[in-house]
Curated annotation (Swiss-Prot):
The entry's keywords: Endoplasmic reticulum, Heme, Iron, Membrane, Metal-binding, Microsome, Monooxygenase, Oxidoreductase
Protein name (Swiss-Prot/TrEMBL): Cytochrome P450 1A1
Residue intervals passing through the bilayer: none
CC terms in the record's Gene Ontology section: endoplasmic reticulum membrane
Membrane topology listed for this record: Peripheral membrane protein
EC id: 1.14.14.1
Group of enzyme by EC: oxidoreductase
Gene label: cyp1a1
Entry-linked PROSITE patterns: CYTOCHROME_P450
Species annotation: Stenotomus chrysops
Length: 521
C-alpha cells in the first residue's frame, strides 16, 4: 500500500542497538578515512556535527519538520545531517527546491535505496522505485494514461459531467446523511472516522467500480489496513539507515510485510475479476482503463517493457494508497478549520448559496465560480502542511546546488512545511488567511500565489494524481459546506496541534454538525 515513508527512526532492541553501535563505530572510522573529495570551486555542505554512533537523530527529534526548519535558519537552504550511517541533504526554500527538482530535475529525480522501499510492490512502486527509466518510466506513463482516460469517463446519468464527479457527489451526499443520522443518535461525531470511510469508498469506486455500505466489513478491512500501515511505518525502520539491522529479526518489518501482502491479495482478487469481465467497449473504472491501455500497448514507443497482470496489481495498489490517506487527511483538516474559524465557514456558505443556491448539488464546473472555497482549500493545504516532506529523493549523479557539492546516491529530504511557512514567502505565515490566495477584488484565485504552496511534490516525481485529488477535495467540501454547519463541542477547546506521522493528522476529537435549512440566508 503506497503511502509516504518519513524521515524518522523507530525504537530498536538491545541486540539491534549493540550491533548498530559496533557497525556505526566502524563506519564512522571508514567514512573519516575515505571522505568524498570536493571538486575545486564547490563548497562542502554545512550542517550540525553528527555523533559517531547515532548521527543527528537526537537533534532531529520527534518533529523533524520543525527541527529541520530551525536548522535551515542556521545553515541555509542546503545543509546536511546524518541519520545512522546515511548522510542526508535537506533542502528548504522555494527557489532552492525549484532549482533542484525542476531546473536540475534529472539530477534529483532518484529515490534512495532504502530497505523498506524494496518491499513496496516488489521494489517497482511508482512512488518509491529507485529506477528512473525502463520499468518505472513505462509504469508511470501507463498510470498517467489510465488516470487521464478515467477522468473523461461519462457518468451513468447526464446530471454528472464525468464518472469522478458521480463517485464523489454520491458519496459526499451519503456522508451528509450519515453525519445527520449520527448526530441524532449520539449528539457528536468523529470527523476523521467518517471521512476516511467515505474517501475509501470513492477510491474503491474509482479503482474497482464498486461502492460499499459504510459498515461493510470489506471496506472497513481496507480502512483498518491503512491505519495499521500508518502506525507501523510512522514509527520508522532503523534498517533504512543502519543497513546491518536488515539481517536481524524485526517484528516491525514482519508487520510491514504482512500488511502489504494482505492488501496485494485483495487487489489481485479484484484485478482477476476485472480480467474475467473486461469489455473494451465498456470501461468501468481505473482497473479497466489499465487493462485497456496494456492490451493496446499505449506505452513509450522506445520501451520494450511488457506489462503483466502483476504490474497492473502494483499500479492499482499505488494509486489506491496514494489517493486514500492524503485526501482523507486533507478533508479532515478542512473540517477542523471550518470549526476553528466559524466566520470563514459562514463566508463559504454565503458564497455557495449565492453561486450555486440551496437546491442544486455543486459540481466540478462550479470551481471557477467559488474562488473563496478554492482559496480556503489552498490555505488548508498550506497552513496544515499535512505532508511536511515529500517522499525522499536521491541524487542520480554527482551534482551541485547553491554552490555546494552533493555526491551521487545522496538521500535528499524536501521540507515542504518550511516552504509553506517561510516568512520570506508568506505574510504572517502562522495565521490562517484564505484571502492571501485571492486577487485584489476577491473574485478569483491568484494563480501565482497558489503555485507557491507545495503539497504534492514537484518535478519528475510530482504526484500524478494531483488533479484528481484536488477535484475530489473541492467537490467533497463544497457539498459539506452547502448542507452542514460544523461546531465544536461545548466547553471543549479545539486542539489543532498536528501529530507527526505518515501524514500529519489532527488529534482525534468529537465535533457537532447541524443540517442547513434550505432557505437559510
Amino acid at each position: 500500500m503506497v503511502l509516504m515513508i518519513l524521515p524518522v527512526i523507530g525504537s530498536v532492541s538491545v541486540s539491534e542497538g549493540l550491533v548498530a553501535m559496533i557497525t556505526m563505530c566502524l563506519a564512522y572510522l571508514i567514512l573519516r578515512l575515505f571522505r568524498t573529495e570536493i571538486p575545486e570551486g564547490l563548497l562542502q555542505l554545512p550542517g550540525p556535527k553528527p555523533l559517531p554512533i547515532i548521527g543527528n537523530v537526537l537533534e532531529v527529534g520527534r518533529n523533524p519538520y520543525l527541527s529541520l526548519t530551525a536548522m535551515s535558519k542556521r545553515y541555509g537552504d542546503v545543509f546536511q545531517i546524518q541519520i545512522g550511517m546515511r548522510p542526508v541533504v535537506v533542502l528548504s526554500g522555494s527557489e532552492t527546491v525549484r532549482q533542484a527538482l525542476i531546473k536540475q530535475g534529472d539530477x534529483f529525480a532518484g529515490r534512495p535505496d532504502l530497505y523498506s522501499f524494496r518491499f513496496i510492490n516488489d521494489g517497482k512502486s511508482l512512488a518509491f522505485s529507485t529506477d528512473q527509466a525502463g520499468v518505472w518510466r513505462a509504469r508511470r506513463k501507463l498510470a498517467y494514461s489510465a488516470l487521464r482516460s478515467f477522468a473523461t469517463l461519462e457518468g451513468t446519468t447526464p446530471e454528472y459531467s464525468c464518472a469522478l464527479e458521480e463517485h464523489v457527489s454520491k458519496e459526499a451526499e451519503y456522508l451528509v446523511k450519515q453525519l445527520h443520522t449520527v448526530m441524532e443518535a449520539d449528539g457528536s461525531f468523529d470527523p476523521f472516522r467518517h471521512i476516511v470511510v467515505s474517501v475509501a469508498n470513492v477510491i474503491c469506486g474509482m479503482c474497482f467500480g464498486r461502492r460499499y455500505d459504510h459498515n461493510h466489513q470489506e471496506l472497513l478491512n481496507l480502512v483498518n489496513l491503512s491505519d495499521e500501515f500508518g502506525q507501523v511505518v510512522a514509527s520508522g525502520n532503523p534498517a533504512d539507515f543502519i543497513p546491518i539491522l536488515q539481517y536481524l529479526p524485526s517484528t516491525t518489518m514482519k508487520k510491514f510485510l504482512n500488511i502489504n501482502d494482505r492488501f496485494n491479495t485483495f487487489v489481485q482478487k479484484i484485478v482477476s475479476e476485472h480480467y474475467t469481465t473486461f469489455d473494451k467497449d465498456n470501461i468501468r473504472d481505473i482497473t479497466d482503463s489499465l487493462i485497456d491501455h496494456c492490451e493496446d500497448r499505449k506505452l513509450d514507443e522506445n520501451s520494450n517493457v511488457q506489462m503483466s497482470d502483476e504490474k497492473i496489481v502494483g499500479i492499482v495498489n499505488d494509486l489506491f494508497g496514494a489517493g486514500f490517506d492524503t485526501i482523507s487527511t486533507a478533508l479532515s483538516w478542512s473540517v477542523m478549520y471550518l470549526v476553528a474559524y466559524p466566520e470563514i465557514q459562514e463566508r463559504l456558505y454565503q458564497e455557495m448559496n449565492e453561486t450555486v443556491g440551496p437546491d442544486r448539488t455543486p459540481c466540478l464546473s462550479d470551481k471557477p465560480k467559488l474562488p473563496f472555497l478554492e482559496a480556503f482549500i489552498l490555505e488548508t493545504f498550506r497552513h496544515s502542511s499535512f505532508l511536511p516532506f515529500t517522499i525522499p529523493h536521491c541524487t542520480s549523479k554527482d551534482t551541485s546546488l547553491n554552490g555546494y557539492f552533493i555526491p551521487k546516491d545522496t538521500c535528499v529530504f524536501i521540507n515542504q512545511w518550511q516552504i509553506n511557512h517561510d516568512a520570506e514567502l508568506w505574510k504572517d505565515p502562522s495565521s490562517f488567511n484564505p484571502d492571501r490566495f485571492l486577487n485584489a477584488d476577491g473574485t478569483e484565485v491568484n494563480k501565482l500565489e497558489g503555485e507557491k504552496m507545495m503539497v504534492f511534490g514537484m518535478g519528475k516525481r510530482r504526484c500524478i494524481g494531483e488533479v484528481i485529488a484536488r477535484s475530489e477535495v473541492f467537490l467533497f467540501l463544497a457539498i459539506l459546506v452547502q448542507n452542514l454547519r460544523f461546531h465544536s463541542m461545548p466547553g471543549e477547546p479545539l486542539d489543532m496541534t498536528p501529530e507527526y506521522g505518515l501524514t500529519m493528522k489532527h488529534k482525534r476529537c468529537q465535533l457537532r454538525a447541524a443540517m442547513r435549512a434550505r432557505n437559510e440566508e
